[in-house]
């Protein structure tokens, strides 16, 4: 997969904020992709040597049957510290290396993290989507910002995630009796469509199959 040269990677939080403020205006939260979708991908991260080495995994699955088509791993020195709200600067450099190795271009990428459900509306899914010009969805295991009403226990139940009067995502139940996930538009996809694809990628478990496969690779399991 061809990767174009991204912006320079920052060394300070101040530089990172400047990049986020610039890129947030390029995020598209309407559906802009070709259907039917044939391939979906997941990306996940692991770290080695006390966090000094980043290990990025990409898993491409066929859709809608969710069979593994291609995987890749990439390693590179970690160049940015762990700071909530800035994880994309720590993780995306290695993710781009892993994506460059794959031959099958995904139609949608599901990221283990936030899309626009982020203080500056540029979580890792949105950041990656803008850099690649590919539709992306944020599927996070925990809440970063926002509030929501109580959620019903049935699969497919969801409530809007609201921050400063704006709907920035949804809390979504993907499995009965299990903690929900936090879904948000990353890039070139609307929230209702993002919810639909997350549900179609979670036939058995809480997390999308894309994330589960990528996580096993990234965790060396």
Curated annotation (Swiss-Prot):
Its cofactor is Mg(2+). One of its GO terms (biological process) is DNA repair. It is an enzyme of class 3 (hydrolase). Its main location: cytoplasm. It catalyses: Endonucleolytic cleavage at apurinic or apyrimidinic sites to products with a 5'-phosphate. GO terms for cellular component: cytoplasm. InterPro entries: Endonuclease-V. GO terms for molecular function: deoxyribonuclease V activity; magnesium ion binding; RNA endonuclease activity, producing 5'-phosphomonoesters; single-stranded RNA binding. It comes from the Bacteria. Belongs to the endonuclease V family. DNA repair enzyme involved in the repair of deaminated bases. Selectively cleaves double-stranded DNA at the second phosphodiester bond 3' to a deoxyinosine leaving behind the intact lesion on the nicked DNA. This is Endonuclease V. It comes from Trichormus variabilis (strain ATCC 29413 / PCC 7937) (Anabaena variabilis). The lineage of its organism: Bacteria, Bacillati, Cyanobacteriota, Cyanophyceae, Nostocales.
